[in-house]
Amino acid sequence: MDVSQFLNNVENDDTLQNIRKEYLNSKRTLQELMTNQSPTKKMEFSKKPTLLQERNSNDYINRNVNSSKPTDDEFLRRQLREGLSRKPEPKISLPSLASDTNRLDSIYSSVNKIDELEKKLYHHELQIQALKNELYQSNASNRALQNKVAELQDSVRMLAALSHSNVKADTDNSQLSANGKWTRHYAGPNSNGNGVYLDRPQSAPSTSSTSEWVANALHDSDDTRVLLGWKQPSSTRVDNSSNFHFPHNQPRNLSNFDDNTSRLIGVTGKTRN
């Protein structure tokens, strides 16, 4: 005989079957009790206090020892005590609509004020920048004017120094002329600035007249260049100042020239007919 068949046989081993039957019977009876129990008793059974709570509560001390089940009055009293012992929940108060509108209006007004202040601040910054630019331009113009004033002062000093030197030279010349030592002449193109000609003799030659000496003195430089071969002789020209005619191709006496001119002619080796 197989083992499984032997174990499943009720006659041979009824332990498992008996356990199953007892479990099902107990489950059925429990369901019947739960369905037959009232709602208040269900709540009381679910909220049954522990042993420690029962010892600490006044209900445990004052309850009737003889009564095996709590009555409905005791259950109501317990609920009343528990409700009084609990702290009330805080009430949430919602703001009213008027307060919200007032708050929004205040926020908008403050924002508008901030915008206006920012605009004013920006405008003031622009004004400050414009004033800075004007100050910079005025400083630059002042510096330019100061430079011009300094230049004018320098030029005035130079003019004063020149005028002082000219006045001093005039006084010296006047003193010399008064003493009869020196006479001021016309400073021509061949003069050294002191009335002394560089390319003519210092005194009139004795072999010619005074008029010839004056005419030769005015044109000594040109005649010297012709004699040295530096310039071609030109046609006869007229001096308007003295009204004399000077033919440059006319032979000229060497006595009209100073020693330096004679030396230059001798060095060049050229002869004059």
Swiss-Prot record:
Q: Please note every region of biased composition (Polar residues).
A: 53-69, 203-212
Subcellular location(s) per record: Nucleus; Cytoplasm, Cytoskeleton, Microtubule organizing center, Spindle pole body
> What cellular component terms from Gene Ontology apply here?
central plaque of spindle pole body; cytoplasm; nucleus
Region Disordered: start-end pairs: 38-72, 186-212, 234-258
Pfam families (UniProt xref): Spc29
Asked if Cytoplasm is a keyword of the record, the answer is yes
A GO molecular function term, named singly, is: structural constituent of cytoskeleton
**Domain of life per record:** Eukaryota
Q: Which GO terms describe its biological process?
A: spindle pole body duplication
> Which keywords has UniProt assigned to this entry?
Cytoplasm, Cytoskeleton, Nucleus
Which InterPro entries does the UniProt record give? Answer: Spc29
State its role. Answer: Component of the spindle pole body (SPB) required for the proper execution of spindle pole body (SPB) duplication. Links the central plaque component SPC42 to the inner plaque component SPC110.
Indicate the family of this protein: Belongs to the SPC29 family.
Protein name according to UniProt: Spindle pole component 29
